[in-house]
């Protein structure tokens, strides 16, 4: 992103899209970044705050749709995922606080119906999420 792009950006853009078509817009908070995608709740919170500052009346429940049901609708898979409904696929995060708070921590994460993370557990599986593909013949620490 160049400096000019930063000056030209509209911080309330997500809220503006949300309010399009008489409040039926399909706003989406997304990230192309491996780290940013882990903080979509915080990005949605920033977008919600920018929208409120711009004068839009948007509830936290509506803003939550920006990272849940709206992306599923946009991808054409809302009949399969995007909301907690019997018969749909869903991963669930149990938060310690309001998920729009920077102080919120994931307490538990359920993926495909199974407990994948529990903050109270001593077991923390390692992940190559932000490391990338590792050569199977090398040790990542020595690379």
Segments from the language model and where they lie:
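Short, solvent-exposed loop/turn and secondary-structure capping segments
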Residues: 105-106, 120
């Amino acid at each position: 992103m160049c400096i000019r792009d930063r000056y030209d950006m509209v911080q309330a853009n997500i809220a503006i899209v949300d309010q399009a078509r008489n409040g039926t817009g399909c706003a989406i908070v997304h990230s192309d970044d491996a780290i940013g995608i882990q903080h979509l709740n915080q990005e949605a919170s920033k977008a919600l705050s920018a929208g409120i500052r711009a004068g839009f009346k948007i509830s936290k429940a509506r803003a939550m749709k920006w990272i849940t049901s709206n992306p599923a609708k946009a991808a054409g898979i809302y009949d399969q995922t995007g909301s907690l409904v019997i018969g749909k696929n869903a991963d669930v995060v149990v938060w310690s606080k309001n998920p729009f708070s920077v102080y919120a921590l994931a307490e538990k994460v359920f993926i495909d119906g199974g407990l994948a993370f529990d903050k109270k557990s001593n077991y923390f599986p390692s992940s190559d999420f932000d490391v990338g593909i590792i050569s199977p013949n090398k040790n990542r620490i020595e690379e």
